[in-house]
Amino acid sequence: MPVCKNCHGTEFERDLSNANNDLVCKACGVVSEDNPIVSEVTFGETSAGAAVVQGSFIGAGQSHAAFGGSSALESREATLNNARRKLRAVSYALHIPEYITDAAFQWYKLALANNFVQGRRSQNVIASCLYVACRKEKTHHMLIDFSSRLQVSVYSIGATFLKMVKKLHITELPLADPSLFIQHFAEKLDLADKKIKVVKDAVKLAQRMSKDWMFEGRRPAGIAGACILLACRMNNLRRTHTEIVAVSHVAEETLQQRLNEFKNTKAAKLSVQKFRENDVEDGEARPPSFVKNRKKERKIKDSLDKEEMFQTSEEALNKNPILTQVLGEQELSSKEVLFYLKQFSERRARVVERIKATNGIDGENIYHEGSENETRKRKLSEVSIQNEHVEGEDKETEGTEEKVKKVKTKTSEEKKENESGHFQDAIDGYSLETDPYCPRNLHLLPTTDTYLSKVSDDPDNLEDVDDEELNAHLLNEEASKLKERIWIGLNADFLLEQESKRLKQEADIATGNTSVKKKRTRRRNNTRSDEPTKTVDAAAAIGLMSDLQDKSGLHAALKAAEESGDFTTADSVKNMLQKASFSKKINYDAIDGLFR
C-alpha cells in the first residue's frame, strides 16, 4: 500500500480531471504520482506540426527503453538479431523449413541464457542448434551438411553439439536414421555403376535390422557400415572390413558384432533373391540382448544339471574330494552320497555367505563360531551316518556316545588352541590349521622355505642350474651376428658421432691444433718425494718471477718451459696465437725473433 511522504497518510485519490491522472493524498493534497506509464498509444505534435508517437516500447526481455535509434539496442538483443539472421541464411541454403528454424532460434535463446554462447564460435553454435531441431523433427540433414555449408570442420561442430546437449540437458533426442549414412559411405567406396543398387540393398537391410530390434542402443554408423558390407557382398563386390572401418569410423569388432547379430535373424537365412523379393514381415526376431542373456542362463543351468547328475558314488567322490574326507572309507550308495554332498555344499555356502555379509566387523570371532559349529555338525553327521549303517542296539549306542564325547573334547581343544594365539588372518579370520576343508596330505607338500634352502647364496655358483637352461641363454654364431646387426642399426647415429669425434681428435693432434679446453682440476698439496722434478720446476718458476718482477708470470713460465726442454718459447707463442683465428695485422714470421 502506498504511503504519503509528507503526512504518512494512506488514503489517495486519482485526479481523473487531469490528463496525467495524478495520484493525490486526501489528507495533505500532495501529488504522490504523476505521468504514469500507460499502455495506450498517445500522439503529440512537434514544433513543425508533425505528429509523433509519445512514449517508447519496452519488450519482455528489456530492462529499459531504447533511445537513440537502432545503434542503441542492447547487446543481448543485437546478439539475438544476428543469430536469427544467420539461422535463416543457413536454413535457406539447406532447404530447412521455417518452423524448424524458429525451433532452432528457441534453442539458441536457451543456450544464450545458460552462458553457452560466450567463448564459442557463433557458426558452431548455430549449426548445433539447427542440427538439434532437425534431429527432433527427424529430417535428413546431417552434421556433414552443415560443415560443408559453413566451411567448418565437422569434428568442431560435433564437439560443440555434444557439449550443448550435455549443458542444456537435452534428452529424448531421436537417433539418426542409418540410411542417411549409407549414401555418404557408398560415395567414398567408389562402387562405380553398382552404387545405386548397393545403396538400395543396404537401405533394405537397415529397415530389416530396425524391425529385428538391432537399431536401438547402437551407433547408426555401425549399422550403416554392416549394411554396406552385406550389400556389397550381395552384388559380388569385394570390400574388406578394413575399407568399411576406414569409411564408417567404427571398430572392426563392432562391425563384426553387428554381422553376428544379423546372422541370428530369419532374414539372414534367406537367399539374396528371396530377400530382395520378400519383405520378411511374417515375424520379428527377438532383441540381441534378450537372446544373449537366455543363452547365458541356459548354459549356467546345463552346467548345474550336469554337476548334479552323478550315476555312481565314485563319480560324486571324485568330483568333490573333500566329501571323501568327511565320509571316510564308508561304503554308501549313490543316492546317499548325493544327499550328503548336497548337505555339505549348502553348509559350506552358508559359511561363505556369513563371512561375506559380516566382512570388516570381527572376522576372527565370526570364523571361530562358523568353523566350530560346522565342525561339530560334520562330526555329528559322521556319527549319524555310521549309526544308520551299523545294526545293533547296545554296542552301537555306546560307540556313538563315546564318539560324541570325542567330538566335544576335540572341539574344546580346538577352541583353546585358537584362543591361545594361533595365527588368524586379519581380513576374514581364515586359518589353515583350523580349516575343516583342508586336505589331509597338505603338510606333505614342499613349502617355499624348502625350495629357498636349496638355492645357494653365491651368485657365481650355478650348480642348481641345468646345462640346458644355460645353453638356452647362449646364442650361436648366426644369432649373435643377427643381434649385433640389430644393435648397430639401433645405435648407428651414436656410433657415427663417436667415430667422427675420434677422427677429429686424431687430426687435431697430428696438426698440433690442440685447442680443446681441459677441465680445471683442484690443486692439492703434494708433498710426496716421488715427484722432485715438479717441485724443482715450480721453485725455478717462482724465482724467475721474482727476478723479472713480472706480475702476470708469463715470461717466467715461458722460460721455465724452455729450460725444461719440452718446447721453445717461440713455439709456445705460436701455438698460443694459433688457437685464435688468423689475423692479417700480425706478422707471424717476426715471432721467431722476439726471444733471441
UniProtKB/Swiss-Prot annotation:
- Comp. bias regions, Basic residues: 516-526
Role of this protein: General activator of RNA polymerase III transcription. Interacts with TBP. Binds to Pol III subunit C34 and to the TAU135 component of TFIIIC.
User: Which residues hold Zn(2+)?
Assistant: C4, C7, C25, C28
Where does it reside? Nucleus
Locate the compositionally biased regions of type Basic and acidic residues. 365-375, 388-421
- Tree of life domain: Eukaryota
Protein name (Swiss-Prot/TrEMBL): Transcription factor IIIB 70 kDa subunit
Q: How does it assemble?
A: TFIIIB comprises the TATA-binding protein (TBP), the B-related factor (BRF) and the B' component (TFC5).
